[in-house]
């Protein structure tokens, strides 16, 4: 009897935890219109929309969507927002003129106009093509983008990502990094914004005045202004040339 009671209690506890999780999932999946000047149902070519005139404030996945005007397609669960558009999620802020929000995919799509992503340290990424997943807190940009850190140094590339949960920018394809004294070109670079640390990989080339250096990996400590290059390091100056396994540059 005691074993049966224990099993029953365990089963009920399991059901309760599943129920709480399901309720949380259901709450997170709902989009809530928190405020606006007006909201009304309209019919556009046979489709039902909620037309929202703002300033409007929506909430989804603990993320705020702000805009001047929005059309919310009830059937496809897509929100078209324009005018002073902002996405606010904890320490990450995205701003643009317009966006398309796919509710079932937790995805904010920015196309055409400039979109700006800024973290708590005022590292600022700008591009014209960006997707932001409000559930995973992950931004993906394509077709070119540039990030300026809080001190004005710039990293640019064809594509990349930003994971706000771990404060990590990733840049891929035709990556250029501009520092106060050194210019770096590489194929892939990761920038940990909370550590002020850039890590680069294969095919890295760096220039400082008339000096050139290449390697297949290394890092740059922004706070201490220190470069470290390793793996097939090749150095050329106007009068010398050398090879080594690793090299520090101050």
Segments the model singles out, each with a brief description of its role:
Residues 22-250:
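N-terminal amphipathic/hydrophobic interface segments
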Residues 1-9:
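Bacterial N-terminal signal peptides that target proteins for export
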Residues 2-3, 18-22:
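Long alpha-helical, hydrophobic tracts
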Residues 8-17:
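Bacterial N-terminal signal peptides
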């Amino acid at each position: 009897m005691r074993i049966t009671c224990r099993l029953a209690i365990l089963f009920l506890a399991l059901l309760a935890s599943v129920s709480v999780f399901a309720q949380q999932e259901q709450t997170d999946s709902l989009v809530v219109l928190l405020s606006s000047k007006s909201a009304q149902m309209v019919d556009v070519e046979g489709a039902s929309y909620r037309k929202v005139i703002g300033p409007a404030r929506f909430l989804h996945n603990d993320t705020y969507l702000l805009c001047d005007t929005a059309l919310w397609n009830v059937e496809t669960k897509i929100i078209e927002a324009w005018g002073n558009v902002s996405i606010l999620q904890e320490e990450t802020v995205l701003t643009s003129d317009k966006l398309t929000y796919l509710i079932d995919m937790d995805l904010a799509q920015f196309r055409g106009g400039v979109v700006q992503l800024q973290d708590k340290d005022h590292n600022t990424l700008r591009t014209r093509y960006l997707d932001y997943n409000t559930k995973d807190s992950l931004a993906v940009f394509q077709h070119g983008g540039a990030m300026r850190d809080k001190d004005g140094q710039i990293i640019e590339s064809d594509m990349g990502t930003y994971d706000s949960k771990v404060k990590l920018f990733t840049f891929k394809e035709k990556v250029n990094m501009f520092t106060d004294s050194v210019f770096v070109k590489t194929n892939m670079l990761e920038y940990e914004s909370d550590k002020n640390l850039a890590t680069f990989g294969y095919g890295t080339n760096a220039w400082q005045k008339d000096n050139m250096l290449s390697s297949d990996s290394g890092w740059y400590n922004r706070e201490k202004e220190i470069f470290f290059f390793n793996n097939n390091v090749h150095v050329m100056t106007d009068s010398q040339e050398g090879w080594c396994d690793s090299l520090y540059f101050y």
